[in-house]
From Swiss-Prot:
Component of the ClpX-ClpP complex. Forms a hexameric ring that, in the presence of ATP, binds to fourteen ClpP subunits assembled into a disk-like structure with a central cavity, resembling the structure of eukaryotic proteasomes. Gene3D superfamilies: 1.10.8.60, ClpX chaperone, C4-type zinc finger domain, P-loop containing nucleotide triphosphate hydrolases. Signal peptide: none annotated. ATP binds at P118, T119, G120, C121, G122, K123, T124, L125. This is ATP-dependent Clp protease ATP-binding subunit ClpX. Keywords: ATP-binding, Chaperone, Metal-binding, Nucleotide-binding, Zinc. InterPro entries: AAA+_ATPase (IPR003593), ATP-dep_Clp_protease_ClpX (IPR050052), ATPase_AAA_core (IPR003959), Clp_ATPase_C (IPR019489), Clp_protease_ATP-bd_su_ClpX (IPR004487), ClpX_bact (IPR046425), P-loop_NTPase (IPR027417), Znf_CppX_C4 (IPR010603). Zn(2+) binds at C15, C18, C37, C40. ATP-dependent specificity component of the Clp protease. It directs the protease to specific substrates. Can perform chaperone functions in the absence of ClpP. GO terms for cellular component: HslUV protease complex. The keyword 4Fe-4S does not apply.
Length: 421
């Protein structure tokens, strides 16, 4: 399509890939009998960059080094440097162990991972990114839906079934996959006395997870066991499946603070020495005994030898999340306003105020969208019916003052007005 018919084709040059003329693009690069425009070059660069990220540079034995894994995590996850390092080393060692398992008579044990951190701090995103880097089957399970076998709810074998589905029923690939079990703090023991009643969704689930996490040959029904009892079972060895468990563990910080205090304390009593410490700081002092007090059984804690704690995202990290990633929230809303032919601008003070509100709400990065919707709701309601609006400016007052609205800049007068309430 370097020279389409029609128009002034003799004098006009066209991109051989997208067909745009030299007048529609900024640059047109010429080669022997072909041309490529700057937009196609940028597209090619994006494709190459994505390919490079998804198949991170390999070390000599085909396993990405911890630094390479950490560098790719940096592209997707903001902050949480300590957790990234812990995860990078654990995952590198796990897949190195698989590649060298038959080369020596020393058997290397598997190191499953426990991620502990407040809501919205990036636990799930870290696990998803790891699977993308390593190009292995990945599945995510919700621990709150699991029950012991024989009770209403999902069996733990359903987790392995989801992993099989992610690997298109390739058993060999599934046996090298990653399973992320979310909300694992919700399956804690419901009572200190386990004999009072049957705990089918708490301690019972922990007991059921023990064998598949440690390594066993699980019989997995390909169509789900309860609806098709007559089907053939697939045998899946879970020995080399990496299990990552994550949870917010609300209240665990108080257990750690009480242990640090070193004395018995009444219910709800404040720990003055730890008042200025954030949740993330207290999580760094975590000991296995704290998890036992929280309600995890000793056998379950023992099968999660690698513990990575994540802290609350600070103000600067939240501002970065708002503006930097490819699909950052600010860019998403700017695109929405672009569809109305209106420019959307956030002042630096406004971004700082949004981050401060998210910190107060204690919802982490997840709370940012809710705050943005709150600020822009009335403007997005009125804007489609308004003429001559060229730009919407969100300043600090529009964020902090519930009655204040973003400023509207009109084309004709260039006069700033408050958005109609």
């Amino acid at each position: 399509m370097a020279n389409p018919t029609g128009g002034d084709s003799k004098n006009t040059l066209y991109c051989s890939f997208c067909g745009k003329s030299q007048h529609e693009v900024r640059k047109l690069i010429a080669g022997p009998t072909v041309f490529i425009c700057d937009e196609c070059v940028e597209l090619c660069m994006d494709i190459i960059r994505e390919e490079t990220k998804s198949s991170a540079l390999k070390s000599g034995d085909g396993v990405p080094t911890p630094r390479e894994i950490c560098n790719v995590l940096d592209d997707y996850v903001i902050g949480q440097e300590h957790a990234k390092r812990v995860l990078s080393v654990a995952v590198h060692n796990h897949y190195k162990r698989l590649n060298h398992s038959s080369k020596t008579d020393i058997e290397l044990a598997k190191s499953n991972i426990l991620l502990i951190g407040p809501t919205g701090c990036g636990k799930t995103l870290l696990a998803q990114t790891l699977a993308r880097i390593l190009d292995v089957p990945f599945t995510m399970a919700d621990a709150t839906t699991l029950t012991e076998a024989g009770y209403v709810g999902e069996d733990v074998e359903n987790i392995i079934l989801k992993l099989l589905q992610a690997s298109e029923y390739n058993v060999e690939r599934a046996q090298r996959g990653i399973v992320y079990i979310d909300e694992v703090d919700k399956i804690t023991r419901k009572s200190d006395n386990p004999s009072i009643t049957r705990d089918v969704s708490g301690e019972g689930v922990q007991q059921a997870l023990l064998k598949i996490m440690e390594g066993t040959v699980a019989s997995v029904p390909p169509q789900g066991g309860r609806k098709h009892p007559q089907q053939e079972f697939l045998q899946v060895d879970t020995t080399n499946i990496l299990f990552i468990c994550g949870g917010a563990f609300a209240g665990l910080d108080r257990i750690i603070a009480q242990r640090n205090k070193g004395t018995a304390m009444g219910f709800g009593a404040a720990v003055k020495e730890d008042d200025d410490k954030g949740v993330g700081e207290l999580f760094k002092q975590l000991e296995p005994e704290d998890l036992l007090k929280f309600g995890l059984i000793p056998e379950f804690v023992g099968r999660l030898p690698v513990i990575a704690t994540l802290g609350d995202l600070d103000e600067q990290a939240l501002i970065t999340i708002l503006t930097q990633p490819k699909n950052a929230l600010v860019k998403q809303y700017q695109r929405l306003f672009d569809l109305e032919s209106v420019k959307l601008t956030f002042t630096e003070d406004a971004l700082t105020a949004i981050a401060k509100r998210a910190i107060k709400r204690k919802t982490g990065a997840r709370g940012l969208r809710s705050i943005m919707e709150d600020i822009l709701l009335d403007t997005m309601f009125d804007l489609p019916g308004m003429d001559s609006v060229e730009e919407v400016v969100v300043n600090e007052e529009a964020v902090d003052n519930p009655t204040a609205k973003p400023l509207l800049i009109h084309t004709d007068s260039k006069k700033e007005t408050a958005s109609a309430g």
